[in-house]
Amino acid sequence: MAQKTPTKGTRSSPRKKAWGSPIKATAKFQSDIFSVEDFADLSNRSWAEVTEEDDELASRLEEERRCKSESRRKGQPKRAQNSQNKPKFVRSLELTNEVFQSTSSRRSQRSKSRTRNGDTITTVEEHTETVVMESSSGPISRKRCLSNASTINEGASPSKRRPETGKSNRKAPRGRLFTNGGSDSSSVASSPSRRDHWEEPTLGWCTDEAVLKRRSREIDRAKEKAVYQRYTSEVPLRDRIKGQHPRTPNKLINFSRRSWDTQIKKWKRSLYEYCGEEPSDSVNTSFCYSDSDALSEAGDNDKEIENRSVLRDLVIPVTMRPEVDSMASLLGKFDVDSQMGMDESTLKASTNTDPSAPTDFSKMSSH
């Protein structure tokens, strides 16, 4: 009798349970999500009523959200706002000014050592330095200005003390250029001078003070004319166009005397032409005629006269060569007809013009 094969009993291990498929979630039906009770009140309404109610609900929600944002904003502390929108460094300077209001001056000590007779002597000097800060309404200066106490010695003479004024200590640019200006340099000092940022012209700058004064006088006297006053009243400075309106020559450039006189004449003539007037006689002449110019021209005329007299009295001896004398004596033996032209003049021979006629030899002397 055949024995039955033993069968292994099935058992479920935790490992097999882990590998088992998860339980599928049962999906809800549409009837479970939307109940009839929730939409019972919509059954008897039209679509226009439902849309109007929806708009009212949306506007109410928007109003609630705005109220919440305003209440949240009011609950936070406001940030300090400056109406002038000042930069950060300006605000920092204002804070520094407030800190140093009570103690606006400070003292610093400087020690100087000097040697006298082999011994080193240390001298301590004190000076007061005041930090000047302007109010917030005006511009704030970053410079440190020394106070009057640091520059004035109590034992010094009163003549060395300079009263503290609000005027600037800087001189005018023309005043720095010409330190020895007199009464004639008033127009020179009032006119603008060259700046450091200007480019160097090709001809260079004019550094002769006398030339600059003379040019300034010429320009000022031309501007005193009625035609220039009319031109400035009709055409303001901001409306003048280069190449279209008369342009005043630049007196600071190192032009030659001839070039400057030509520019002045053209400028004055262009003023009359622009205003539609007839140029006067002063257009072709210079307004200023200095003594130095007169002396220089007089000296030139004297030199020219002296040179002419010397050339007039100069006698140059001409040496005749011997071959020239012999040629002159040879030509003297021939009778040249001077009444005829150079091309037609010939040596006189027989009056018989017929070459075939016999020649008369009776006048020839027999040897």
UniProtKB/Swiss-Prot annotation:
The keyword tRNA-binding does not apply. Residues 206-275 are annotated as: RNA-binding. Ubiquitinated by the CBC(fem-1) (Cul2-ElonginB-ElonginC) E3 ubiquitin-protein ligase complex, leading to its degradation. GO terms for biological process: apoptotic process; embryo development ending in birth or egg hatching; mitotic chromosome condensation; mRNA 3'-end processing by stem-loop binding and cleavage; mRNA transport. Residues 1-24, 49-200, 342-367 are annotated as: Disordered. Residues 57-73 have a biased composition (Basic and acidic residues). Involved in histone pre-mRNA 3' processing. Required for chromosome condensation, progression of cell death and morphogenesis. This is Histone RNA hairpin-binding protein.
